[in-house]
Amino acid sequence: MKKRILSLLLILVMTLSLLPTAVLADEAETDYGITIVSPDATTQIDVTSKNYKDVMLDGTVSYDPETKVLTLNDANLGCIGASQIQKPLTLRLVEDNTITTPQGIYSNALTMDSLSIEGDGRLHVKAQLYAANFYVGISYQQSGGEVTLEGFGVLNGSSGSVKLTGGKLTLIGGMPQMDKLLDAAAGTKLALFYEDGKDLGSWTLPTDSTNWSGLLSTAAKMTLTAPAALDEASLAEL
C-alpha cells in the first residue's frame, strides 16, 4: 500500500513538473507607468499587462507596450499621466477624443516627459491648469490628426520644442514661449486670434516677418496647419 501511495505521489510530481509555470501561478503584473483618470475623477486606472488591450473596458483605450503607443478611439477621459515610461509616449488618434480635467480639480490634462501625436483622428484637451505639462522641458511632436490644447497655460516648460510635421494644432490659452519653441515644416500656416475670435493675422512659415511673435502676449488663440493638412483641405473642397 505504501509503495502504491509513493508511486502515485511520484507520478503527480512528475506531471506537475511538466506543466508551464503560468498554470501553477499567475504571471506577475507589469505596471507600464501610465495612469488614466475618468472625467468625473471617480475612476483612476493604471495601465498594466493585464488590462492594456482594453484599459477602460469599453474599447476606447488600448496600449502597445512594445512601441509605447496609446491608442484613443472615441475616448472621453479626465487626464493622462505618463511620467514613468522610458520612451516617449505616442498617442494614436482614431475618431473624436476628449480629455477634460474634472471640474474643481486644478490639474494638468497631460503630464509626461515627452509626447508624440499620430493618426488621423481628433483630440480636444481642456484643462483647469496646463493642457500639457512636461517634466523635462517641452517635447511635443505631431505628425497627423487635429489637436486642440486649451487651458490656463497650454504647454508648460521653459525649454524644448514643439514640432509639427503634419495635421493641425490649435492652442487656446497662455503661449508666451511659442516663438522660441516652434519647429514647424516649411509651408505651415500660422494664425493668431483675439479672445473674441477676431483675426490678429496669419503667416506662412518660415517667414521673415517677426510680427507674429510680438503679438503672442495679445493673442488668445493660435492655429498651426501643416502643408499636408492644407493640401487635404484643398482637395476636400474640389
Protein language model annotation of sequence segments:
Residues 16-23:
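C-terminal segment of classical bacterial N-terminal signal peptides
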Residues 1-10:
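Positively charged n-region of N-terminal signal peptides that target proteins for export
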Residues 26-238:
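A composition-driven surface/loop motif
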